[in-house]
UniProtKB/Swiss-Prot annotation:
Gene3D superfamilies: Dynein light chain 2a, cytoplasmic
Classification via SUPFAM superfamilies: Roadblock/LC7 domain
Protein name: Dynein light chain roadblock-type 2
Subunit structure of this chain's protein: Homodimer. The cytoplasmic dynein 1 complex consists of two catalytic heavy chains (HCs) and a number of non-catalytic subunits presented by intermediate chains (ICs), light intermediate chains (LICs) and light chains (LCs); the composition seems to vary in respect to the IC, LIC and LC composition. The heavy chain homodimer serves as a scaffold for the probable homodimeric assembly of the respective non-catalytic subunits. The ICs and LICs bind directly to the HC dimer and the LCs assemble on the IC dimer. Interacts with DYNC1I1 and DYNC1I2. Self-associates. Interacts with DYNLRB1.
InterPro entries: DYNLRB1/2 (IPR016561), Roadblock/LAMTOR2_dom (IPR004942)
Similarity comment: family membership: Belongs to the GAMAD family.
Biological classification of the source: Eukaryota, Metazoa, Chordata, Craniata, Vertebrata
Length: 96
């Protein structure tokens, strides 16, 4: 098992985690624990939102960069960890 697979398995085992996915720089999912339609929807929308958030952070301070994005709604909490080539996305129940 690769280090990436071990990390994803460890994250997925946390209480309340609904799903995890890794998305490439173009917004295409390359690893997921969710069904296909949910994965495609989340990957596309969160990729756009993350790119906009990165751009906003840089517009405010060109020396700065987005390191983590957390979105909490009534139903879910979505955490995005952007890297140069990938996004790690974790969806969990907010009450846990």
């Amino acid at each position: 098992m690769t280090e990436v697979e071990e990390t994803l398995k460890r994250i997925q085992s946390h209480k309340g985690v609904i799903g995890t996915m890794v998305v490439n720089a173009e917004g295409i999912p390359i690893r997921t624990t969710l069904d296909n339609s949910t994965t495609v929807q989340y990957a596309g929308l969160l990729h756009q939102l993350t790119m906009k958030a990165k751009s906003t952070v840089r517009d405010i301070d060109p020396q700065n960069d987005l390191t983590f994005l957390r979105i909490r709604s009534k139903k879910h909490e979505i955490m995005v960890a952007p890297d140069k080539e990938y996004l790690l996305i974790v969806i969990q129940n907010p009450c846990e």
